[in-house]
Amino acid sequence: MNRRGRFRLYAGAALVAGLLLRLWFVAHLARVAGDSLVYGELAKNWLQSGIYGFGHETTSAGAIVVRPTLIRLPGYPLFLAACFRLFGVENYRAVLYVQVAADLLTCWLASALAGRLFGGRAALVVLWLAALCPFTANYAATPLTETLVLTTIALAFYGFARWQQAGARFNRWLWVTCAALAYSLLLRPEQSLLAVAVVPAMLWAALAMPGRRMGVLRSTAPVWVAALCVLLPLVPWTARNWHTFGVFEPLAPRSASDPGDPQFHGFNRWYRTWAIEFASTDLTYWNYDGNRMEIAKLPARAFALGCLAPGGVVPESLPLYAPTAALFDDYNQQTAASWPVDDRFDQLARRRIRASPICYYAALPIARVLNMMFRPRVELMPIPDTWWKSPTPPRQTAFAAAYAALNLAYFLLAFAGLLAWRRRGWAGFGALAGAMAAAVALRLLLLLTLDNSEPRYTLELFPVFLVWAGALFASPSARPATWAGIAAEQSG
């Protein structure tokens, strides 16, 4: 077998291995709960009643009326509705299989882009790194936006590279990039940052094209048209929200509440004065306004006047333990948010912020982002949130630690690859490199503003990281233009 045949064999083996890994997650760790059911209900009601909203019981016995909502963008419910139409309503197993295919497409796109930038060897290594990445594969087994968002990110950067190679004019790759950016924006509101990173880089690429004698306006016309097309899908959504609710809402409200719903901010502010770990998100943040909250689940720093509690001190002796315990007791009487309870949380928050503003505005946001980046990504597995504490079985603790080490390895490969790419002078793709770096930086800046730490919010870095890692395995020969060219390079 020649080198070309071996390349195709190894690439095929990577995709098969990636398929088996994702099917294993679907078979053993599929999870349909929480936000998955929220999206599912929106899709079902949209499909069956034509109303994008949630069902509510009326005073009539057993009667359900669907009321419109705007708390979620329609991109993922649209995907679910299409799957429900094809495979049956609430057939989530079929949805997961479609997501498996989408995730494998993400692997291929990252590999193909790495091949164009760094050659065939890099393409093959990136394909294996992507196919065997358990963190992205795990999310293919749960009906959430993450898998499709990763695909749109990979497609946007791949389309950008192809568009630039084709002369940065009006061509099919311009429309591919537009579609990827637009649908990514319909999936999650913060994906507007992807367009913010990519569109200026496209302007840069259009203006920097060698030999172009057109004026600035004509040279950049494709980019302005692309920017308009990215925003077009938001027009009917914005018009619908104005017509239905009387509010201007082109995306989705950060509070995840409809107009007229009470918005309680005191608890969230208090939570931001001490929270770092995903365990706090799961055990406290998600329980507010609906479930009991246990004060024993709070770390000692939640009762201190500062970022950290003194070592060796029992929580009950800290200055804010008594008022916090009394507030928890009152809340747990009803397990529902109310203005008096929320005001007391706000008072606690203000007291803590006055005592240590640097902690609230800088130290804790950075700590939360670091936790999202480097925590073991086992949140979808039957492993305790506090995996490092007893009584977690030692085998589970060891597995979580190994997962954290693997995650760190992906980060190190990515940033080492970025430095290697820079040493190569970006190989003619400086605008693309700038867009990728901007997408990562903007996302990390956004995460600094969030209340709750969730590792899934940093999954969106992986399509970029995989391509960057490919620079460490760059071929010394010229870049191939196509995947067929990559294989042909191997036979040369």
Regions found by a protein language model. Give the residues of each.
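Transmembrane signal-anchor helices characteristic of membrane glycosylation enzymes that use polyprenol
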Residues: 6-33, 229-240, 442
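Membrane-interface anchor segments at the N-terminal boundary of transmembrane helices
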Residues: 8, 90-94, 334-335, 343-347, ...
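Multi-pass, polyprenyl lipid-linked donor-dependent membrane glycosyltransferases
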Residues: 34-39, 94-102, 125-160, 171, ...
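Short hydrophobic/aromatic helix or loop-helix immediately within or flanking a transmembrane segment
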Residues: 42-47, 60-89, 100-101, 460
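Loop-to-helix entry region of an early transmembrane alpha helix in multi-pass inner-membrane enzymes
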Residues: 74-81, 86-105, 127, 139, ...
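Transmembrane-helix motifs of polytopic, lipid-linked glycan transferases
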Residues: 94-118, 155, 415-419
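Membrane-interface transmembrane helices that cradle and orient dolichyl/undecaprenyl
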Residues: 117, 156-174, 204-208, 473-476
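Membrane-proximal stem/loop segments at transmembrane-domain junctions that anchor or position
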Residues: 250-378
